[in-house]
Amino acid sequence: MHRDLSHYDRRYFDKWYRHPRHRVKTKQDMRRQLGFIVATAEYLLDRPVRSVLDVGCGEGNWSTVLKELRPGARYTGVDGSAYAVQRFGARRNIRQGTLGTIGAIGVKGPFDLILCLGVLNYVAPDELRRGLRQLRTLAGGVAYLEIFTRADEATGDFRKQKAQWPSWYRALFRRAGLEDNDHGTQVKRRAIGAGLNYSVDWESRMITRLPPNRRGGGVRY
């Protein structure tokens, strides 16, 4: 069953990305966050990030920040919003698709960095499982997966009562081959600022943002 994405129109993006009272991140927030992501990815890869896949990219706003940080990096965005693709697709290299269909829309990897920010908690379990497996085939470096869970206090159109616990997502990552590795070696760091916790998996080179361990499991530091 395909999700109805028609509500991701200009009014939606105006409210959550531009309205000063409702927007979830400012341009300064985005610079700090992507700066952290790119720096961490390059530390793990021991080389510059040259290609980025942004899944659920919306209007492709991360592409403008990436251009400031790494002018030569190749950006590919994927989003289900017909409005976003029509308005920004050609200018920002955005293709129409979703996490679940990314394997069928001609996206060619591997990518040094895969971004999936504030998307996974909106995706149905079957599509999520399928999409994570597809991301694994496109990953050629680091994947940054940002998820809001039932243990989070989040703003925006996030519905906490429909969210899963951190341990549920961890299990999905393991089954998709995105977290566990043959060496069993993990390095976890706590990021400074905004009270956000990040797990950096050294061997499989995945960064996940999940809240501290609470009911149902999660991340321990």
Predicted ranges, named:
Residues 1-107, 123-138, 142-221:
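Class I (Rossmann-like) S-adenosyl-L-methionine-dependent methyltransferase catalytic domain
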Residues 115:
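A conserved beta-strand element that flanks and buttresses the S-adenosyl-L-methionine
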Residues 118-122:
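Short catalytic micro-motifs in class I SAM-dependent methyltransferases
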